[in-house]
């Protein structure tokens, strides 16, 4: 036991929690904590260039490792700048603890300099928040915060710390709690055995079943159980955008991603299924389209650790509240008692016919660089082993469709909130967590400029990532919608006065490459990967065909079976 100030307790609490890295930006309300980081030691702090980037770095750190990311920001604008990143983590169920400074307790509510109600502002986008009023409460609050962030359905936690409880002259006995008890919070992890048996029996009787896997498989570390279970029952598997990598992308039973830009075979399989085994998903609007037309003949089996997600949008015939890993393990165990399991030959023959539509075909003989070719070439050169972060837009969808992910936690993107500017800082967070891995940020000319200042952070901490900028001089997804829905009226979707991205990256001390011709694509990507392996951050600016659209695309207001497919093109 030690006698410590509040600021020292913050640092010691992080150390006792096992935290090695935090991401932040100093300011008046948290200077005592920053001083303690220096005097106490034991934690590496990454100085970002904008607080939003701090949250995205912590987010990437968390998604790639499963650990809780930690952010430290000052009061007022420091805290509000973090809001977008907190919302991003909340929508995708990512564990994060955000420590925000606050004005002194006596000044709260008096519009003091850099005061804002961080608890009130963040309430809709956090799992829980704490306003700490006593120095001696810091250890127990931090213990609770990390438990809440990572248990049940993970999510972000805010800890708001008034400046006066951090001061050096306020010292108290420090003791890290051995255990905590939160009476109102007791997440269910073990699914009800009766419901599990009923769900398995229903699934095995089905003639047209499909497994629909989401991000909950990844957060529960149950990808291996999913693979074993799916193989044993020979069932087709489709994934949400957040679920990519939960089931091997090149596996024969994988029918690719479903939803707004899902493959023809995935969406048709869902529409015609008689049983949907949904696990670790929340049936968001990008995967269901019109709920009145959604999978009309299917019995829905829904497994999720969050009871509020079950039957929220799609009614579950057999709901199971529990951890995906536990439920799948129990189902695998129960399968041992089954004497005969159908091979679903007729169902697979139907799916193979849908696959022959080749909904991902595109003109590969064009004299312009196609974004699909860029992604496929990257997969070929990296053999699918890289960690890929993505910004939001067409490049995100092209990556999801043309880069098969065979392992979990390799695909890192903002799925729920759709946050542009996420990709670069998230990639830096991944690289910090996994310094020996190849980390690639796939972005566009719109998204990259939202947090491009973090090239400076990358330089300061020698975080070598590859930035692949699919440059179409426009806001590609906005332009696509304008083409399809607004009769081609391109209102403010073209990007004029773009910087020279190669020179810009070089000005930060990095290596830049521009690719303008299809014939040079593979050679220059190989050069970029070579420079990356030598420890350089590499910015690759690829001038792609700006007329290219993402297909398939579901028709607004339609069922899962109603999609726009690419017209056959002439070279």
Swiss-Prot record:
Q: Which InterPro entries match?
A: Acetolactate_synth_lsu, AHAS_TPP, DHS-like_NAD/FAD-binding_dom, THDP-binding, Thiamin_PyroP_enz_cen_dom, Thiamin_PyroP_enz_TPP-bd_dom, TPP-bd_CS, TPP_enz
Biological source species: Buchnera aphidicola subsp. Acyrthosiphon pisum (strain APS) (Acyrthosiphon pisum symbiotic bacterium)
Q: Which biological processes are named by the entry's GO terms?
A: isoleucine biosynthetic process; L-valine biosynthetic process
Its domain of life reads Bacteria
Protein name (record) = Acetolactate synthase large subunit
The cross-references to PROSITE patterns, in alphabetical order and at most eight, read:
TPP_ENZYMES (PS00187)
Also noted in the record is:
Contains 1 molecule of FAD per monomer. The role of this cofactor is not clear considering that the reaction does not involve redox chemistry.
Positions that bind FAD: 153, 261-282, 304-323
* Similarity annotation: Belongs to the TPP enzyme family.
Q: Name one GO cellular component term.
A: acetolactate synthase complex
Q: How is the cofactor bound?
A: Binds 1 Mg(2+) ion per subunit. Binds 1 thiamine pyrophosphate per subunit.
Q: Which UniProt keywords apply?
A: Amino-acid biosynthesis, Branched-chain amino acid biosynthesis, FAD, Flavoprotein, Magnesium, Metal-binding, Thiamine pyrophosphate, Transferase
Q: In which pathway does it act?
A: Amino-acid biosynthesis; L-isoleucine biosynthesis; L-isoleucine from 2-oxobutanoate: step 1/4; Amino-acid biosynthesis; L-valine biosynthesis; L-valine from pyruvate: step 1/4
- Name the segments for region: Thiamine pyrophosphate binding: 394-474
Instruction: List required co-factors.
Output: Mg(2+); thiamine diphosphate
Q: Which gene encodes it?
A: ilvI
Q: Which GO terms describe its molecular function?
A: acetolactate synthase activity; flavin adenine dinucleotide binding; magnesium ion binding; thiamine pyrophosphate binding
SUPFAM superfamilies in the record, alphabetically? Answer: DHS-like NAD/FAD-binding domain (SSF52467), Thiamin diphosphate-binding fold (THDP-binding) (SSF52518)
Under the subunit heading, UniProt states: Dimer of large and small chains.
This protein's record includes keyword Ribonucleoprotein = no
